[in-house]
Amino acid sequence: AFSGKYLSVFLTNLGDIETRLRDFIVGLKRVFASTYGPDPILYRVDHGLLDYDERMAMVVQKVVGQRFGDYFLPFASGVMFSRNVYAWNPKIKKEEGLVRLVFGLGTRAVDRVGSDYPRMIPLSHPQLRPEITAPQIKKYSQKQLDVLNLKKGIMETVDFRTLSAVMDHPELFYAVSVQKNGHLAPPMFKTQNLKGEE
């Protein structure tokens, strides 16, 4: 799929109007220039599209989310596929699709990064997961997330523990598991203090 081949630019939209306009124009130029990057060109070569005129439309949209300290992020983001080519169980219906879900900005749902993993959700059986044991679930879980740092004016990657220290949000209950005696479980209650938990 062509999704994720072109550059996405996140702006914090802070400062005076001249600064924000300048940042916006620079962002537009960076996205348009990304049509000449290696990923889009290789994709076009692989699909016999290299000799076609490359046209691009630009989408500018507001990031929906909340501020937590210096960070701004959506609680969850994802990418949905109309066909699931990663069916790890015979019960999964490939034609019903797949969602790759992450905590924070959706950049990690589009492109998997290093040893960090999105949550894979088959739409035919959303409770099924490819991991079975607690160590597997822990290994193949998201540990870092992308956020907008409003103080620095940039998108950056933060460790989940760094964010949880400034995030007082009852919905965090749905994004974490607590390990006790070799088992993973949701926190006991929504307001449980997770500091010091594994």
Predicted feature residues:
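Conserved mixed alpha/beta core segments that line enzyme active sites in large multi-domain catalysts
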Residues: 1-198
